[in-house]
Amino acid sequence: MSLEEKEFKHISVLLQETIDSLNIKPDGIYVDGTLGGGGHAYEVLKRLSPKGRYIGIDQDEDAIAAAGKRLSEFSDQVTIVRSNYCNMKQVLKDLGIDKVDGILLDLGVSSYQLDTPERGFSYRENAPLDMRMDNRNSLTARDIVNEYSEQEIYRIIRDYGEDKFAKNIAKHIVRMRSEKPLETTDELTEAIKAAIPMKIRMNTGHPAKKTFQAIRIELNHELEVLTNTLEDMIDLLKEDGRLSIITFHSLEDRIVKAAFRKNENPCVCPPNFPVCVCNRKPKGIHITKKPILPSEQELEYNKRSKSAKLRVFEKHE
């Protein structure tokens, strides 16, 4: 299947909810930090006037190519940049943009990445262990699995996969690689399966899911990038501008929720102080105290939306 066909079949999660959450101004400037195939971008662009601008950022070469084709009818308004969204501030500075009306992040791995076996993201298809979102980087999942210490692998699976069998999985990975390096997704999956009791494997989801997630997060620095970039993104918003973020697991959601709460209520004074003396000012409002979840209808036609959560922050100074 070609890249175009795969991207055509990709379904953007929480599409209408995300578009609504951005409160789009027709003449506004919007930034997509995880452009992907351009599904969300297309819907935003349809709502912009000829004066509106859209900047799409993605580190994945295939995503850049697919989005460029999908958004070609808006070429006068769209700027696509191959980069990580952690560089958003610099990307906008290079374009002469100081503030924007809205920012969107759709985190995690894309359907295209999962459905392209040779990318090595999926435990359902045998392929070389890769998992790089940006193939310009030299480090791959194979390097992590074969070169990290047992303690490091345990830490990754425990912290980023939240798997209670993390210690045993790390032990089995190291044991199997001592016989021969683990080269493929199937070989890694076999090591994981061997570490988890059959009774547990029969009654839960795929045993490799959490470990694959953990290795991918470690390799691509996903949580580190998110944590270190949230403040910059809020600062880039104009008054009334909105930051909308779709997360797919609790680790991401906790980081976003904490950052939004902190920027809504930044005061660190003890509760018994009569007045604030820390002088930390709120930057806006976390307008989704409870995250927006996929509808029953969306869950039916897009199973991958099951764990998605949308949170929105509105800038006020």
UniProtKB/Swiss-Prot annotation:
It catalyses: cytidine(1402) in 16S rRNA + S-adenosyl-L-methionine = N(4)-methylcytidine(1402) in 16S rRNA + S-adenosyl-L-homocysteine + H(+). Its main location: cytoplasm. SUPFAM superfamilies: Putative methyltransferase TM0872, insert domain (SSF81799), S-adenosyl-L-methionine-dependent methyltransferases (SSF53335). Its EC number is 2.1.1.199. Disulfide bonds: none annotated. Transmembrane segments: none annotated. It is an enzyme of class 2 (transferase). One of its GO terms (molecular function) is rRNA (cytosine-N4-)-methyltransferase activity. It comes from the Bacteria. S-adenosyl-L-methionine binds at G38, G39, H40, D58, Y85, D106, Q113. Specifically methylates the N4 position of cytidine in position 1402 (C1402) of 16S rRNA. HAMAP family: 16SrRNA_methyltr_H (MF_01007). Belongs to the methyltransferase superfamily. RsmH family. This is Ribosomal RNA small subunit methyltransferase H 2. The lineage of its organism: Bacteria, Bacillati, Bacillota, Clostridia, Lachnospirales.
